[in-house]
């Protein structure tokens, strides 16, 4: 669910790890498939940095859970609580700013489409990209639908709002999504609860996928244009480029009628 969380677990003393000691469990091995990162500090002085790294990883990029597994003797000993101001995490590089060329391609595809639509997911809310989303929708006069987790990303009393799609969505939202020829999908993983049959969905339209997690790009749907980066930062770049192009659509689109 992309929820930031720190889970702290206890472990047998360091010297007994790997010896099948009483109540020992390989919690690191069990948790790795479902967490962003797992730490097991072996010395008391390693705890502050592990905590600092844990909170950083849980809250940056695509938010998610982090495990801190602390052996019993590490818990019982004393050490200075010096939290580092700077640290390095090998292999962890959260995406923030998008590739400008990709955003340009996304704009071109939207402008050249006859029936474009916006699908806003939960990532829009996590990134607090409310104003940017509304600006894009109003500038290009794009109807907006949301996933179940994206509900609230766009004002539902707005003239361009159609509400949520999917098996628990609105009929008019599902109808417009079915008829669209291009979708700007923002912060969504294309759950089957929202889009139904994956193959049928991607055959109908071109997909511009904007997401902070590169692992989501192309996972469930074939993507025509990928914009990898923080959703709010990516939409801000799109707003800026649209202003530079002086793009402004009107409400006389047959698609909107």
Question: Predicted regions: what is each one?
Answer:
Residues 1-256:
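N-terminal alpha/beta PP-like core and its mobile active-site loop of ThDP/TPP-dependent enzymes
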């Amino acid at each position: 669910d992309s929820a930031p969380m720190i889970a702290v677990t206890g472990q047998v003393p360091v010297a007994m790890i790997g010896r099948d000691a009483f109540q020992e469990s390989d919690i690191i091995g069990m948790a790795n498939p479902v967490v962003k990162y797992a730490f097991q500090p072996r010395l008391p002085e390693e705890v502050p940095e592990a905590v600092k790294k844990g909170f950083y990883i849980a809250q940056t990029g695509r938010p998610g859970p982090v495990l801190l597994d602390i052996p019993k003797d590490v818990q019982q000993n004393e050490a200075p609580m010096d939290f580092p101001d700077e640290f390095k995490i090998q292999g962890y590089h959260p995406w923030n700013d998008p590739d400008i060329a990709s955003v340009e391609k996304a704009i071109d595809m939207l402008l050249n489409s006859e029936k474009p639509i916006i699908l806003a997911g939960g990532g829009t809310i996590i990134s607090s990209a409310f104003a940017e989303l509304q600006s894009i929708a109003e500038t290009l006069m794009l109807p907006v639908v949301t996933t179940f987790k994206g509900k609230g990303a766009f004002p539902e009393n707005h003239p361009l709002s159609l509400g949520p799609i999917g098996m628990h969505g609105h009929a008019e939202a599902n109808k417009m999504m079915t008829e669209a020829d291009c979708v700007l999908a923002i912060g969504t993983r294309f759950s089957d609860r929202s889009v139904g049959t994956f193959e049928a969905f991607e055959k109908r339209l071109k997909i511009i996928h904007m997401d902070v997690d590169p692992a989501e790009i192309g996972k469930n749907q074939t993507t025509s244009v990928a914009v990898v980066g923080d959703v709010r930062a990516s939409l801000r770049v799109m707003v800026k480029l649209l202003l530079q192009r002086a793009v402004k659509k009107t409400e006389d689109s047959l698609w909107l009628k």
